[in-house]
UniProtKB/Swiss-Prot annotation:
UniProtKB keywords: Coiled coil, Golgi apparatus
Segments of skewed composition (Polar residues): 88-100, 109-121, 239-250
Role description: May play a role in the regulation of insulin-dependent IRS1 tyrosine phosphorylation in adipocytes.
UniProt entry tagged with the keyword Coiled coil: yes
Source organism (scientific name): Danio rerio
Family label: Belongs to the GKAP1 family.
Coiled coil among keywords: yes
Protein name in the entry: G kinase-anchoring protein 1
BP GO terms, sorted: signal transduction
Length: 368
């Protein structure tokens, strides 16, 4: 497989040289005469494969041309990135050099009255910081670019391996079928082969991606990543400086950082207060709802208790009425019983008299 080797040596001017060596053309050129020799050495069979060979050659030529165009576009993009000029702020005067600045610092008497070494030092410091930040961005961009290119190469290798594996499997299956065409035996397929066939059938075909759009997205994403990383590093430095570390910065810068930090803390506190207010309002609404429910339940219970009491009183009144009726009936029955008893006693007292009269009548009848 052809592999692109990209060597990007760096010097003081960010990128001095960019080399793109591709082995694909050389490999393809070396492979041509060998293939031709092999084809010439083989005896021709009865069939004429000229149409298939011409189609295969055309496909190979198109693939090589596309590879060359893609590699050329990548090389152009890399060259444009490599030889892009670094923006520098010309804050220091052109005549002032590091040697002059060192001499002025060592021998302050030689310095002119109108010069201000402190201002020159600040200018040089700003320029140095700008240069270091630019170089850092350039190195970071280069590292990200190389890592992403390496990742793309590995991805291409994996894709080619995936595309090659089903072809070999299908070729082996075709050979098996050809060998077993004359036989009437049943073919036994293992479970793994069956599952792999289903996966290959269900696997969707990947859509071709335009290389120009892919390159544009790649470099735009690279620049965005570099800017994000630089901003994050600057924020970390500002936070560490404001946390109390000894940094040689001006008092105004420290005050600005402190004010920004206080503003950020105030915003956090305001957000917390707003959240607490929301929660308090929600709890108040829930408290009102619960209070209303409790009042309704109390009313319902009171109504139920009153109903129960009224029903009990009615039942008591009914029972009292029944009791009075039963007591009156008992008194009536008692009087009737007494009357019957008196009647029985009167009859018992009159019974011997009647018996004596009956005996006298019987005796008189016997005499007659």
């Amino acid at each position: 497989m052809a592999s692109a080797v990209i060597s990007v040596p760096t010097t003081a001017s960010r990128f001095a040289l960019l080399q793109v060596d591709s082995d694909s053309d050389s490999d393809s050129d070396v492979g041509k005469p060998k293939a031709a020799g092999r084809g010439a050495g083989k005896p021709r069979s009865g069939k004429s494969p000229s149409g298939k060979n011409s189609q295969n050659n055309e496909k190979k030529k198109e693939k090589r041309r596309r590879k060359k165009e893609q590699q050329q576009s990548e090389a152009n993009e890399l060259r444009s990135l490599a030889f892009k000029k670094i923006p520098q702020k010309s804050t220091a005067p052109p005549s002032l050099t590091l040697q002059d600045l060192a001499n002025d610092l060592i021998n302050p008497a030689n310095v002119q009255q109108g010069s201000k070494p402190q201002e020159n030092w600040q200018e040089w410091k700003q320029r140095d910081e700008q240069l270091t930040s630019d170089l850092y961005e350039a190195d970071l961009e280069k590292a990200l670019m190389l890592s992403k290119l390496e990742f793309e190469e590995h991805k291409k290798d994996a894709d080619k391996a995936e595309t090659a594996s089903p072809k070999t499997k299908t070729g082996g299956k075709k050979d098996r079928k050809k060998n077993q065409q004359g036989k009437d035996k049943r073919v036994t397929v293992s479970l793994k082969d069956f599952q792999q066939e289903d996966q290959l059938k269900n696997k969707p075909e990947r859509e071709p991606v335009n290389p120009a759009l892919r390159d544009d997205k790649f470099f735009n994403k690279l620049e965005d990543d570099v800017s994000k990383i630089v901003q994050r590093d600057k924020r970390r430095e500002q936070y560490s400086n404001s946390a109390g570390q000894e940094v040689n910065t001006s008092s105004e810068h420290e005050q600005d950082v402190r004010t920004e930090q206080l503003k950020y803390e105030l915003e956090k506190k305001d957000q917390e207060i707003a959240k607490l207010k929301k929660t308090i309002s929600q709890w108040e609404e829930r408290y009102k709802e619960v209070k209303a429910r409790n009042s309704q339940l109390l009313k319902m219970l009171q109504q139920g208790e009153m109903k129960d009491k009224a029903e009990i009183l009615l039942q008591v009144e009914e029972l009292l009425n029944i009791k009075e009726e039963l007591s009156s009936q008992v008194t009536q029955l008692h009087t009737a019983l007494e009357q019957e008893r008196s009647k029985v006693k009167g009859l018992q007292s009159e019974q011997p008299k009647h018996q004596g009269n009956r005996k006298g009548k019987k005796a008189s009848e016997g005499d007659v």
